[in-house]
């Protein structure tokens, strides 16, 4: 997976897909086992100033630092400091937001759209899930019948 952006937003109700993409992006951005340049924040109590301070810190023997923020509520409540920061953040910092609810009219959403990539992960219907399960089984070299 090629990483071309500094900021990613995974948003929507489909928690399994969000976790899969979060794990893939994390692996692509940092070498295996690099805990020195990885930070994880979760919940509405996340301090924007602390996140920005960490993003300003140079990575330790690596090209980038990854900061993952999950269900912070930053996209529902105004976060002007963070939206301004994203527009001028250093190349050594990467943000990965994982949110269930976002306000697409907000400044932070617009800043991420301008500087990064937004992936919406809506709940999948039965037919889509069935195709996905079949493809996963086939990748394992197994077979399953429709009636199973």
Model-derived features: positions:
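Conserved beta/loop motifs at nucleotide-recognition and modification sites
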Residues: 1-148
């Amino acid at each position: 997976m090629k990483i071309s952006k500094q900021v990613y937003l995974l948003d929507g109700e489909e928690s399994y897909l969000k976790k899969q993409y979060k794990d893939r992006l994390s692996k692509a951005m940092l070498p295996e086992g690099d805990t020195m340049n990885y930070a994880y924040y979760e919940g509405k109590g996340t301090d924007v100033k602390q996140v920005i301070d960490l993003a300003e810190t140079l990575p330790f023997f690596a090209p980038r630092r990854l900061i993952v923020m999950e269900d912070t509520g930053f996209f529902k409540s105004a976060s002007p400091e963070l939206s301004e920061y994203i527009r001028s953040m250093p190349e050594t910092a990467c943000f990965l937001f994982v949110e269930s609810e976002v306000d697409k009219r907000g400044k932070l959403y617009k800043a991420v759209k301008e500087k990064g990539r937004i992936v919406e992960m809506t709940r999948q219907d039965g037919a889509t899930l069935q195709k996905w399960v079949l493809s996963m089984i086939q990748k394992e070299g197994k077979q399953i019948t429709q009636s199973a």
